[in-house]
Amino acid sequence: MGRVIGIDLGTTNSVMAVIEGGEPVVIPNAEGERLTPSVVAITPTGERLVGRFAKRQAITNPENTIYSIKRFMGRRFDDPEVQRTIKLVPYQVRRAQNGGVEVKMGDRWYTPQEISAMILQKLKQDAEAYLGETVDKAVITVPAYFDDSQRNATKDAGRIAGLEVLRIINEPTASALAYGLDKKGEEKVAVYDLGGGTYDISILDISEGVFQVLATNGDTHLGGDDFDQRIIDWLCDEFKRETGIDLRQDRMALQRLKEAAEKAKIELSSVQQTEINLPFITADATGPKHLVKTLTRSKLEQLVADLVEKTIPPMEQALKDAGLSPRDVDEVVLVGGQTRMPLIQRKVQEFFGKEPHKGINPDEVVAIGAAIQAGVLAGEVKEVLLLDVTPLTLAIETLGGVATPIIPRNTTIPTRKSQIFTTASDNQTQVEIHVVQGERPMAADNKTLGRFILDGIPPAPRGVPKIEVTFDIDANGILTVSARDLATGREQKITITASTGLTEEEIQRMIREAEEHAEEDRRKREAIELRNQAEALLYQAEKTLNEFSDRIPSELKLELENKMQAVREIVERDPMNTARLRPAYDELARTLSQVGARMYEQAGATASTGPDGGGRTSGAPGEETVEGEYREV
């Protein structure tokens, strides 16, 4: 059986962790780093890059570099937040056939699930290389405020990447697991999680290994990306005021601005001001233009003040739902890189009246919590019980378009609840069950999760038939709905899959493509390794020729030169063709080995024939040869 790892699949960065010797540890990626940028790209030569290498080339290849894909997961193209994000990214986005989102990379269109799967596939491969064994199962975290379709999309991404997703858990809950694993006694903990693209606030009760979520709230479209965008907008406005040039029209310039904005924001968490210096950002008839601006911490705080304020109402609502006041909270845990900003730390401290806990790494804590949950499921971690909640009310549409709640928000999961409904008109033989998620009183104002028909109801006056509707939420927060006519026992059941979700056929196709790409990646790695070995062998052969040319027999020297030329030609013209390079490499290695053997024979012959013709060497004339003394150490 393969290992189970915990994965924080983030908007900006992703992290993976595992239980080793009973303790959670972060797994470094192939580049030796603990954070993997959630970035995927196709280069002009058709090579696919994931992580740091994809992020590094984003400035020169903005249209084919996909980032912040989490903001599109499980969302409809018409969603106002999706439309807002489309205006800010340099890559192309279009409506998918099912009403969801597709992004263009290279000459192909991909779903957000496929892009996320590419990130997960890299994490899986790097974890396998680090652990030295197969990784085929994972616990993946999502924002607490992710709805049903976003959770399903995340699970699909895991399947495409070749991972069995044992559990989807909420990011703040995972953080609380990491924080409270060794804590004794009872504590009320608030987890304030502001990441690259999402914001969550969760209130938990932690007591002797039981982690119970009391309430959760948040905004799935508020995060560090929005803070970066405020800096980008300010730079564009300032540059336009000074030069008359609008940098928003230049995709390459925007990518440079994004990188500079993120860097400046990070620096201003530890210094009072920073210089943003972007030479040759653009050009006009008068020549090249340079952007040089000083950004102070106070100016940044002015630019983002309203974004920070947007995090306050969800905190108030979560506390209200939990039946607590700020002073009832014993500890506040900050999660997500954006919480390193001093303004956010001050605001949180003002709200709760206590300094936030700073003993955990906000970038890594979610993955560590996911690894703990993975350890619980694998039996490696004992005496830990996680009781999470559903973040949004689940309801069905009833007469007049009203959303009638079945499971209120912040209900502990897994859970199962039923309610009896009836027909709205005489002799009605079927009913449509319209399932929605959200807090609005009218069904049309909430998010549709799915619709299905229960038919075969015997004709009767309205109000007579009794139809039992049951909602069943599993531990992943994923919903199954069933409707049963109590008179006939006739039942209809669906697991809710979003209208923007993937069909089973699409998922299987994507799994095959991902496996094929993994095989292609393996062949590419082998080809690169062989090329490196060939270049090293060429260097060794050239060195041997240069140093010992006069001692190598002419026919062997000619053979060596020919074999070197054959390898050099393939390395220079067709280095990825292992079918040609492997035999040429083997031939060169064999010939070089023959050269070495011939030279060794010559050296042996020379050593055995001293100036006196004997095989024994002697000291200087008249001196006795002294036996060497050996002492055991």
Swiss-Prot record:
UniProt KW keywords = ATP-binding, Chaperone, Nucleotide-binding, Phosphoprotein, Stress response
Question: Which residues are annotated as modified residue Phosphothreonine in the UniProt record?
Answer: T198
Annotated region Disordered: the residues are 601-633
Description of what induces expression: By stress conditions e.g. heat shock.
Q: Which GO terms describe its molecular function?
A: ATP binding; ATP-dependent protein folding chaperone; unfolded protein binding
Parts of the chain that traverse the membrane: none
HAMAP family registered for this protein in UniProt = DnaK
Q: Which family does it belong to?
A: Belongs to the heat shock protein 70 family.
Quote the function comment for this protein. Answer: Acts as a chaperone.
- State the protein's name: Chaperone protein DnaK
Q: What is the lineage of its organism?
A: Bacteria, Pseudomonadati, Thermomicrobiota, Thermomicrobia, Thermomicrobiales
Q: Which gene encodes it?
A: dnaK
